[in-house]
């Protein structure tokens, strides 16, 4: 298979032609060893073994202490869309943080250490912004590392949502992650408005996907009353990647402020926030950026809003310009750019984890990661389709892929819809065999092969386990007994 040609096809929205031996371990290993496209950076991450995934204590026994002797000993981790694996660099960075803090205490804020991977603590947020700039397609001054995602959404809406008697609506998706819903709802209520009248929901035309055409049409219809558009870059349930540049351009034609929640997009797909003229965006860093559970989040504010003046919404001392921050004269001078939107001193330990995780991104590019991701997810889709075709019962497929079939409009994630009672049994079967993915009610198993650390062999092994888990328990026992008898013969 010509992998480079296949990636080119996928970038154009076309499906590659898979060889007859695609559903074999040898084929998966061939892709993993190919020099035609970027290789995995799996060696930069801590990949849990199957034994470690089952541990209930931090004390090691012989099994949990043992290193994987082969890939068969490692778990299959397809949950980077929920929490990314730990980069090995994070441990190094945390050790440097602890030693610096322990050695020079408050001097850690200002004193550079010659042999440390860290900058002085007061400069860490700016360094993380610099490292995130290529990932989201912005200049460092347009990015700030602060808070967590929902707090940043609130701060951005406090600055950019300016409802009037006529223009008061916020457009959002029909099924946002609950925290987004609560944030939008409470911002509307904070202004004394009724969410039932001021929340405008974009609904799918059919099934689970929102079309660009329907979004643009709704903007046209509601433009006179829209004060803000806030949509997800990638919808968390379906994995749909929205057409950010087209929708943003259309909002701009109507003079409507537009912001994006990029929780599932940042570090996953190529973004050009500055060039696309996005007003603001927010993202978390614990998914595809691998900075750890609840890690410090990121926000983007376009440079056209970066002069700030006094219009940074809610203020705090850390948004004050660094050059005069410690004068303490209560005369707010905002830091130019996105960092003027800071309120509090960001957590240095959180920034340490983020800086460590971002150091791995400096060894690759988002374009290379996207190329690898396109092929990984297309391979997963191909094998899922084969499994579905082999397991039709009573004329029904065992599951449905609800993510977009056009590879241009999805990231790493494929959302597999099963009947909810079946989902629990299948999910348990996956876990029993060292597979980690996640489930979302009703009936969805989200499968996300992450290009940073997942392999084509991971995909192949996952599919073999999934097909076994789809079989009713009685059939599994019969099949296992038959295989045991055959082995004795």
From Swiss-Prot:
Gene3D superfamilies in the record: Aspartate Aminotransferase, domain 1, Type I PLP-dependent aspartate aminotransferase-like (Major domain)
Broadest EC class assigned to this enzyme: hydrolase
Alphabetical UniProt keywords: Cytoplasm, Hydrolase, Pyridine nucleotide biosynthesis, Pyridoxal phosphate
Cytoplasm recorded as keyword: yes
Catalytic activity: L-kynurenine + H2O = anthranilate + L-alanine + H(+); 3-hydroxy-L-kynurenine + H2O = 3-hydroxyanthranilate + L-alanine + H(+)
Database matches in Pfam families: Aminotran_5, KYNU_C
Region (Disordered): 1-25
Disulphide bridges, residue numbers: none
Domain of life: Eukaryota
InterPro entries: Aminotrans_V_dom (IPR000192), Kynureninase (IPR010111), PyrdxlP-dep_Trfase (IPR015424), PyrdxlP-dep_Trfase_major (IPR015421), PyrdxlP-dep_Trfase_small (IPR015422)
GO CC annotation, single: cytoplasm
Cofactor: pyridoxal 5'-phosphate
Pathway: Amino-acid degradation; L-kynurenine degradation; L-alanine and anthranilate from L-kynurenine: step 1/1; Cofactor biosynthesis; NAD(+) biosynthesis; quinolinate from L-kynurenine: step 2/3
Subcellular localization, as worded in the UniProt entry: Cytoplasm
Matching NCBIfam families: kynureninase (TIGR01814)
HAMAP family given in the database record: Kynureninase (MF_01970)
Protein name from the UniProt record: Kynureninase 2
Native species: Phaeosphaeria nodorum (strain SN15 / ATCC MYA-4574 / FGSC 10173) (Glume blotch fungus)
Lineage of source species: Eukaryota, Fungi, Dikarya, Ascomycota, Pezizomycotina
Gene that specifies this protein: BNA5-2
